Amino acid sequence: MSRQLVDIAYNAIKNNKIYNKKPFTFDDIINEIVKNSNVNLVEVNSQLGVLYTTLIQDTRFISIGDLEWNLRERLSLDEITKINNAMYEVGLYKDSDREEDEHEIVKNDKLTQSKEQEESDEVSSLSDFVGYEDEDEEFKNNNTSNKDEIEDEEELEEEE
């Protein structure tokens, strides 16, 4: 449905002399859709998000900034290039990518250090448990010696 609405808007704006070489707004697009179709404003408003997304993806339209649009076919290649350069600020992505890469490297280094520290802590914690084996043996020995003492005491009591 939204593709059909964009087609209606394209044909209406292309054939309307008011918009000849003159930018138009998203509201103008909506008004042209309502005027040139059997779709009412409520139906169009319920489709605004999808309509806007479809409009952005449609190569016949170009956003020229400041919430204004134009038909790509009405602009020269130089004008389109200027708009694209202004919109995307040529070179900005390379700089921001480099900054993001550096940020990612620092972030990954911190994560690696954190994981290494956790592993180190786990190893030291596990080494604490290694000593428990000796303590278990000591406990067993104490229990056996305690049992022996109890048995000796029971024997003495029986003799008496």
Swiss-Prot record:
GO terms for biological process: DNA-templated transcription; regulation of DNA-templated transcription. Residues 149-160 have a biased composition (Acidic residues). NCBIfam families: RNAP_delt_lowGC. Residues 94-160 are annotated as: Disordered. Residues 104-117 have a biased composition (Basic and acidic residues). The keyword Transcription applies. GO terms for cellular component: DNA-directed RNA polymerase complex. It comes from the Bacteria. Gene3D superfamilies: RNA polymerase, subunit delta, N-terminal domain. It comes from Ureaplasma parvum serovar 3 (strain ATCC 700970). Belongs to the RpoE family. Participates in both the initiation and recycling phases of transcription. In the presence of the delta subunit, RNAP displays an increased specificity of transcription, a decreased affinity for nucleic acids, and an increased efficiency of RNA synthesis because of enhanced recycling. Residues 3-74 form the HTH HARE-type domain. This is Probable DNA-directed RNA polymerase subunit delta. Keywords: DNA-directed RNA polymerase, Nucleotidyltransferase, Transcription, Transferase. InterPro entries: Asxl_HARE-HTH, RNAP_delta_N_dom_sf, RpoE. The lineage of its organism: Bacteria, Bacillati, Mycoplasmatota, Mycoplasmoidales, Mycoplasmoidaceae. RNAP is composed of a core of 2 alpha, a beta and a beta' subunits. The core is associated with a delta subunit and one of several sigma factors. GO terms for molecular function: DNA-directed RNA polymerase activity.
